[in-house]
């Protein structure tokens, strides 16, 4: 087709092995990637090129890609008012349609709360911040409590769990915490609500001999709250059918990303392709294992779905931050391990079980003094855990789609361990959609 001089000359980046014109760079701008440019620094003993990354070429390509993005904004400014208004309306309805509410829980009376019992544990009253947080959780059916250490997250969990049960917002809530803290959580709940039916899991309950009986106990009884440690929670089997659906959805996203990269041909790095192919292989292995579990399952296994838990409070929720995610980016620093941990994946299975039961997002409350510690990936993963339906409404199915809207990559140059200057990409800037 017809190509203007602007495409073929002005936006041309000359590499050692090949050139990249404006059309190539436009594709990279749309996919939020950059050409993987190499150059030769000599020959090896067999006469083959010794290849290294062409940092100068990549830097120039990044500059041209930024120019294309800025040019798109300039092009938009030149369009008719009607076109801009229509585009703005479409964007705002999809991404910029939320206003952060202010929650005032001062009107709550907490009729079953035993303040005398709490006083024996050194708790004199419920802080306004705790009331506001409980009101937020009751209104939304869960959320994030990012209060600092010492601001009373334990009491928030206990009151919110009991209030949800009292108001039929949840029928069987669960609280999980660190092994060192979970006894304190159970004692606080018992002091706050001495008449509540609480099931607190001991180490003996989770012994191999007693575990099946304990799981059936959760399933067959109407407890006000079930309390256990993170480690104990990890021993609860998850529904294999639900695992199969989630892993298949992850695999579908990986295959979509692979197809996008293959369409770009040699414009993308082998490492990027290799990373996604490895992830695909790992997911296929997990799916095979789950399918085997479905075929060989016995009737006496009680899984999380059968227990009837319909809300889970996760104290120190940052312990589950290493959730699996899909990305095409292989050279962006600070993204973490996209494979994630089995511990976090197990939590995703549990939260999805609750969300499928209730037919809506949330169904869980994350409590931590360090909700986000060191990367934007953790922010995306909070949405993945808690707001899957909203992400689907926004057509966000992977980290790359989310970061293209809400984040921006920055490129810096720094010295590596061999004192050479290397390019480092980071997902640093959070861009508000407003």
Where are these regions (language model features)?
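Charged, low-complexity intrinsically disordered regions
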Residues: 1-95, 194, 218-226, 242-264, ...
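Conserved pre-motif I regulatory segment
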Residues: 105-143
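Pre-Walker A (Motif I) flank of P-loop NTPase domains
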Residues: 140-143, 171, 362-363
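Walker A/P-loop
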Residues: 141-160
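Conserved SF1/SF2 helicase motif Ia
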Residues: 160-185, 358-361
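Conserved P-loop NTPase motor "coupling/switch" region that bridges the ATPase
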Residues: 191, 195-204, 248-277, 311, ...
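Conserved helicase motor
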Residues: 201-209, 231
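Conserved RecA-like ASCE ATPase "motif II neighborhood" in helicase/translocase motors
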Residues: 229-257, 272, 279-307, 342-350
């Amino acid at each position: 087709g017809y190509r203007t001089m602007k495409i073929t000359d002005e936006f041309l980046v000359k590499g050692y092995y090949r050139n990249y014109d404006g059309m190539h760079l436009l594709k990279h701008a749309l996919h939020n990637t950059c050409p993987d440019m190499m150059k030769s620094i000599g020959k090896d003993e067999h006469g083959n090129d010794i290849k290294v990354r062409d940092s100068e070429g990549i830097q120039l390509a990044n500059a041209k890609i930024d120019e294309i993005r800025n040019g798109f904004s300039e092009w938009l400014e030149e369009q008719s008012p009607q076109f801009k208004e229509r585009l703005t309306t479409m964007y705002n309805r999809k991404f910029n349609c939320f206003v952060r509410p202010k929650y005032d829980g001062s009107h709550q009376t907490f009729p079953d709360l035993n303040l005398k019992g709490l006083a024996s544990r050194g708790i004199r009253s419920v802080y306004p911040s705790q009331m506001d947080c409980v009101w937020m959780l009751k209104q939304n059916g869960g959320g994030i409590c990012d209060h600092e250490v010492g601001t009373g997250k334990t009491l928030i969990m206990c009151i919110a769990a009991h209030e949800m049960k009292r108001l039929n917002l949840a029928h069987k809530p669960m609280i999980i915490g660190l092994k060192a803290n979970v006894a304190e959580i159970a004692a606080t709940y018992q002091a706050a609500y001495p008449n509540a039916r609480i099931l607190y899991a001991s180490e003996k309950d989770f012994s191999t001999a007693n575990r099946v009986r304990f799981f059936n106990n959760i399933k067959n009884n109407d407890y006000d709250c079930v309390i256990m440690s993170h480690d104990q929670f990890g021993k609860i089997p998850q529904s294999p059918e639900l695992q199969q659906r989630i892993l298949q959805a992850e695999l579908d996203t990986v295959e979509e990303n692979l197809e996008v990269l293959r369409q770009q041909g040699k414009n993308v790095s082998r490492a990027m392709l290799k990373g996604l192919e490895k992830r695909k292989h790992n997911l296929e292995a997990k799916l095979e294992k789950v399918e085997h579990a479905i075929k060989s399952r016995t009737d006496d296994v009680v899984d999380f779905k059968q227990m009837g838990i319909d809300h889970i409070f996760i104290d120190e929720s940052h312990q589950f931050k290493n959730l699996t995610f899909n990305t095409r980016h292989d050279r962006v620093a600070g993204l973490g391990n996209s494979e994630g941990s089995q511990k976090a994946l197990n939590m995703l299975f549990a939260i999805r079980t609750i969300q499928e039961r209730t037919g809506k997002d949330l169904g869980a409350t994350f409590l931590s003094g360090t909700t986000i510690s060191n990367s934007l990936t953790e922010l995306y993963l909070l949405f993945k855990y808690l707001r899957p339906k909203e992400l689907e409404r926004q057509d966000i199915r992977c980290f790359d789609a989310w970061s293209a809207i809400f984040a921006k990559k920055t490129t810096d140059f720094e010295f590596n361990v061999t004192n050479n200057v290397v390019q480092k990409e980071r997902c640093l800037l959070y861009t508000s959609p407003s």
